[in-house]
C-alpha cells in the first residue's frame, strides 16, 4: 500500500491554522508530472470502455487494485497498459484537457507536462494530429482554467534508441514542433538503460533550444545522476533519489543550483524508497540542494500535488512560509519566462501574507 500523509487537522504551531487549507489554496507550479500517468480513474475508465480489448479495468474502484505496484518493473508494465488506451487524437485531447482541469483544481498556475509522443505515434496516431491535439487542449485549458501548460518530450528508455531518434525528430522538426514545447527528457527504467547512450539525442535537442531534464537516480545509484549531468547536460534531475548516497554529488547539485524534482509518494509506490520517513528529501535540504515537490503519476499512486506538499510539510517541518518557499522553488526552477515567474511568485507572496494576516 502507498503511504499517505493528510495535513487536515495538522495545525501550525505559531498560527494555529490548518495547513491543509493553506496548501489547497497555495498557488503552485509543477515540474514533474506525466501526461498519461495523470489520467484520472474516471478518464482511464472512459478510455478503457472505448477500447474494450484492453486489460485495463473499466470500473474505477477496480483501478485502485490495478494501480497497486509490487516494484518499479510492475509499475512500468501497468503504465504501458494505460498508454495503450491512447489511440486517437481525441483520446489525446481529452486526456490533456482533463489533466489541466485537475491541475487547476489544485491551484497549479504553471505545469511542465512530460509527454511521450513516441508511444502514440508508434500506435498509429498521425504526428500532426497528435501535436494539434495537445496544443488545442493546452490553449483551451489556459483560456478556461488559467493554467499554463508547457511540454517536455521524453524518450521512453524501455523502447531503446529507435524511440530516442523518433522523439528528437519530433521535438526538433520545425514543421511539427509544438509551440508549448520547452524541454527534452528521458524516462522509463534506469537499470540496463545507461544514460550516456542518449547523449547524441540530447545534444541535438539542446542545440534546438530545448532544456535537458532527464530522470536519473530513481532506481539506480548516484552514478546515473552524474551521467545525466555530464553526458546529458541536465539542468534539472527527475527524482535523483540516490543523490543522497554521494556527498560530492550533493555538493555539486547545491553549488550549481541544479534542482531535484522530488516525488515522495511515487518513490514509495515503486519501492524506490521503503518508507516516507526514510525519504532523502531531508538530506537534500540540509545539503542546500534546490528541492521542488511534484506528483509524478498522481492517480496511479493515489496522490495529488496538494498531498505531496502535505508530506513535505511533515518531513521538513514546514510552516506556511516554508511551504510558500517550496512553491517558489518550483516557480524559479521552471522554464517559464522571467515575467511569468515574477507574476506567480508575487501571487504566492500575496496569498501567504493574506493568510498570515492577523
From Swiss-Prot:
Residues binding substrate: 87, 154, 188
Q: Name one GO biological process term.
A: menaquinone biosynthetic process
| Record protein name field | Aminodeoxyfutalosine deaminase
Q: Which Gene3D superfamilies does the UniProt entry name for this protein? A: Metal-dependent hydrolases
Report which residue ranges the record marks as coiled coil.
none
**CDD domains attached to this UniProt entry:** ADA
Q: Which UniProt keywords apply?
A: Hydrolase, Menaquinone biosynthesis, Metal-binding, Zinc
Per its Swiss-Prot or TrEMBL entry, what cofactor is needed? Zn(2+)
> Which Gene Ontology MF annotations are present?
deaminase activity; hydrolase activity, acting on carbon-nitrogen (but not peptide) bonds, in cyclic amidines; metal ion binding
| Function comment | Catalyzes the deamination of aminodeoxyfutalosine (AFL) into futalosine (FL), a step in the biosynthesis of menaquinone (MK, vitamin K2). To a lesser extent, can also deaminate adenosine, 5'-methylthioadenosine, 5'-deoxyadenosine, and 2'-deoxyadenosine.
Concerning its family, UniProt says: Belongs to the metallo-dependent hydrolases superfamily. Adenosine and AMP deaminases family.
The note describing how and how many cofactors are bound reads:
Binds 1 zinc ion per subunit.
List the Pfam families: A_deaminase
* Annotated catalysed reactions: 6-amino-6-deoxyfutalosine + H2O + H(+) = futalosine + NH4(+)
Residues annotated as the enzyme's active site: 218 (proton donor)
Pathway listed: Quinol/quinone metabolism; menaquinone biosynthesis
| EC number(s) stated in the UniProt entry for this protein | 3.5.4.40
Q: Does the record's keyword annotation contain Zinc?
A: yes
